[in-house]
Structures are given as structure tokens and as C-alpha cells.
Amino acid sequence: MLNTSFCSGHHWICSLLIVLGSMTLGLVGGGVVQAQTTTAPQADPDNAEQIALGQQVYTSFCAGCHGSNLEGQPNWQKKLPLGNFPAPPHDETGHTWHHADQWLFEVVKYGGKYHAPPRYRSAMPAYQEMLSDAEIWAVLAFIKSRWPTAIRAQQEQQNTRNR
């Protein structure tokens, strides 16, 4: 509680204390909010319910480019005339498993350019307006559930490094 008799003769000091106190609360409060909105990897390839949702979402939003069996497009490593690449496979023959869950989540949510170098051309759209976070995590759980055990273990090492 502020001593009002002190403030009557020292308005500028009281004002400064109030401003600094508010800024401190804002920084501390902002850190709490930031900590609450940072998402940890939530793609569980052993969760049948999450996998089922992920398969439905994948079929509706992803299979058109990445293939109904996660096979991707032919020649996915060869640049197209417009400078972008065909959609890669999400099975063990692709590079999806080389990335941590959070990285994959961000690419789906914010689009292919999110982690790409400047001027990189990507046909991967952002799904932040179309899919919920839970649906994106479910798609990742579905994809991971299709990988062989050894690939899942290698990809989990990426998650461990990023925690």
C-alpha cells in the first residue's frame, strides 16, 4: 500500500513507482501467459482416439498432396519449374521423421515457409485458420503411428533434443 502523505509532496516519485510496478507485473504476467501458450509435443502414436481423428483430418486435408498412404508425390526431391518441390512422403521413405514434433506442428499450422530459408518457395499452406491445434496434433499422431518402430525411436530422439 502506498503512503499517500508521502505522495502528496513527491508526485513524480509515486508516478514512477506506479509505472515501474505496472511494467514489472506486465513482464511477469506476460511470462506466465507465454509459458501457458507454449505447446509441448502432443502427438501420441499409441493413442487410438487421437490416431482415428488424425486419419480423418489427414484424409480430408493432407492426402490430396501427400498421398492416401503417406507416399507423397513422385520425384518429391526434384525441384519443379516454379521453384517449389512436390509434396514429400510422410512414411519412412521421406524426411518427416527427421524433425521434432513441435517443428512439424509449426509447419502444418503456419505453412511450409515457417522454417524455410528466405525466398524458399513452398506449396505447403498454413492450416491455422482451418484446423485446431488438437487436429494438427492428431494428424501428426496418425502419421507417426504408421512408422516402423525403429523410425519412431529415431524421431523421438529429435523430440528429446528439443525439450
Residue ranges of predicted features:
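Bacterial N-terminal signal peptides
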Residues: C14-L27
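N-terminal secretory signal peptides that target proteins for export/translocation
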Residues: M1-G9
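Electrostatic cytochrome c docking/interface patches
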Residues: G30-V57, A153-R163
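Gly/Gly-Pro-rich "capping" loops immediately C-terminal to redox-active cysteine motifs
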Residues: E71-F105, A126-M130
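Solvent-exposed, polar/charged alpha-helical surfaces in well-ordered, non-transmembrane soluble domains
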Residues: A52-S60, P88, Q102, E106, ...
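Axial heme c-ligation environment in periplasmic c-type cytochrome domains
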Residues: K78, P88-P89, V107-W137, Q154-N162
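Short, solvent-exposed loop/helix junctions and linker helices
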Residues: A48-A52, Q56, W97-H99, M130-D133
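Periplasmic/extracellular electron-transfer cofactor-ligation site
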Residues: E49-Q50, Q55-P86, Y110-Y120, R146-A153
